[in-house]
From Swiss-Prot:
Pfam families: AMP-binding, AMP-binding_C. The lineage of its organism: Bacteria, Bacillati, Bacillota, Bacilli, Bacillales. It comes from Bacillus subtilis (strain 168). This is Long-chain-fatty-acid--CoA ligase. GO terms for molecular function: ATP binding; long-chain fatty acid-CoA ligase activity. GO terms for biological process: fatty acid beta-oxidation. It comes from the Bacteria.
Amino acid sequence: MNLVSKLEETASEKPDSIACRFKDHMMTYQELNEYIQRFADGLQEAGMEKGDHLALLLGNSPDFIIAFFGALKAGIVVVPINPLYTPTEIGYMLTNGDVKAIVGVSQLLPLYESMHESLPKVELVILCQTGEAEPEAADPEVRMKMTTFAKILRPTSAAKQNQEPVPDDTAVILYTSGTTGKPKGAMLTHQNLYSNANDVAGYLGMDERDNVVCALPMFHVFCLTVCMNAPLMSGATVLIEPQFSPASVFKLVKQQQATIFAGVPTMYNYLFQHENGKKDDFSSIRLCISGGASMPVALLTAFEEKFGVTILEGYGLSEASPVTCFNPFDRGRKPGSIGTSILHVENKVVDPLGRELPAHQVGELIVKGPNVMKGYYKMPMETEHALKDGWLYTGDLARRDEDGYFYIVDRKKDMIIVGGYNVYPREVEEVLYSHPDVKEAVVIGVPDPQSGEAVKGYVVPKRSGVTEEDIMQHCEKHLAKYKRPAAITFLDDIPKNATGKMLRRALRDILPQ
């Protein structure tokens, strides 16, 4: 079984059930499956072969689902890319990923025209029309490669032969966010994606009664598995939100009686801070899921109290398809914890020599299971560093309690060493978030001539008039001296990536320290 065959099975069993809703449109499972087959046929008719690479530069839309599953059905490897990346970033991924075809919105045509000479391997450009007129390219060479999404979907004279994938075939190359160095392309297999989506769906009890809000970006692995693949494996309905905003999410949840919402902590913070947010806005929600970054306990508690919902924190990473841990809702959760290992996945905390550590000791979290990638594309040294004896070394520092619950302490590379003492940014950030006038907070290490490094805090205040002294006094009550920020800078906003994860590296690069 794989994602495509499971969706086919669902379409056969529940043809008239609604697979997805987008704005005022809906699509049944039978309709979705037919579009997927036609897209797979169209790709093959256009010259794409099993093993070729196709990049998706699309926002949240039914086109993303059709293209994703259609490519997999034709045996083609999908390379999802954030369409808002810079030309340099996109060019790197298209080149490094050996992309042969691109699917993107028509507004991306000028971008492709400006860089096509540096992309000789790209032979096909499929544009999704956003207006009535077909996009036109000035360059005749580009015009030769162009077609539209609608043309690819036109029924062919005869259905092509579907390419049944081998479980270990690469299905997706997912580029990491590149917090250090160049982004790395994690090769996720058909088995990786199916096993994780299936296990997540089972763990969360997803079924045809669920309406799942898809407000995270589809090109991100968190959304790909939790908001798209898992619901479609379960016969649920995917409620596609083109772009996250608190007002639109509240409206969507109410109109469609959504039952599951997944987001990163920043999204929950925006929802919580929204002036019109009230308890009955989430009255239909049976489950909220948080991932992508650690959620401050103060925010989790306040959000649950305001909206009357339960938030389950989980943990995952691109290289693990992504989910490895979830807080169980059948035997109690622990705020601040990422929960316990999900079915078929092992997690453990080890020392620098790979030896498992006892409960409560901090070490590196490593993961093993059918969800773990087979390696980084064209990066054997990085693969060897990340995968050892079947275990994925995550680079995250964690601890485990006696009940088997795991707690992320911080990224290894984000740890701050002050006068020889380890300071974990998350611990300091939890204290900052507990201040009533702090809306967002993040800390980094900055050079210090006396202690080697010092803690520097960045805060987005809830109101004007908050002073550095206010924050410092709060920290003095809750933190040892060496853990306290040496300085606080107030910002209007903290730099974030496409999924809302705060970017410490941007603070180091562009903000005064």
